[in-house]
Amino acid sequence: KLYLGGIKIPSPLGTLGHSDGDPVLHAVTDAILGACSMGDIGEKFSDKNKKFKNIRSTILLGKIIKQIEDNGYLINNLDINIITQKPKIQKYKKLITNCIAKICNISSSQINIKGKTTEKLGVIGKEKAIACEVVASVIKND
């Protein structure tokens, strides 16, 4: 199964991971945690903990959103680069944006998604990997 940004993408390939392996939501979660100086996804949801085996990344991100909100943070903006040769991201951008916005309690206008390729170079170009980079901007309410 291939999940990108919480959306199941039709593909003969999938990702490996302790959870559902969604590289987009994992990167979003890590970026938000980093922006709030609250650690990382591996600290919060260890792959040694069986209760997180095969868990949907939408659930993990939802738990982090609750934690940051409880600590007075709000997401201002998410800028997301999805780097993959296949599948092409363009036709899934709106679905992914809406899914992430709903989980994060923000407007879809606060999320920007870009699909990139490596022009067939490296493991991503050979369709053996997917990468995702995310910059998260947060606001602390005092």
Regions found by a protein language model. Give the residues of each.
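A broad, structure-centric signal for solvent-exposed, well-ordered loop/edge residues
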Residues: 11, 16, 48, 113, ...
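C-terminal edge-of-domain segments
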Residues: 124-142
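Short, structured patches in soluble enzyme cores that scaffold and shape functional sites
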Residues: 6, 115, 136-138
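RNase III-family endoribonuclease catalytic core
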Residues: 1-94
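Structural signal for hydrophobic packing residues in well-ordered secondary-structure cores
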Residues: 32, 36, 65-72, 100, ...
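Short, conserved loop-to-beta-strand elements that form functional interface hotspots
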Residues: 79-88, 94-124
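Short, low-complexity, polar/charged sequence segments that are solvent-exposed and flexible
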Residues: 8, 21-23, 99-103, 130-134
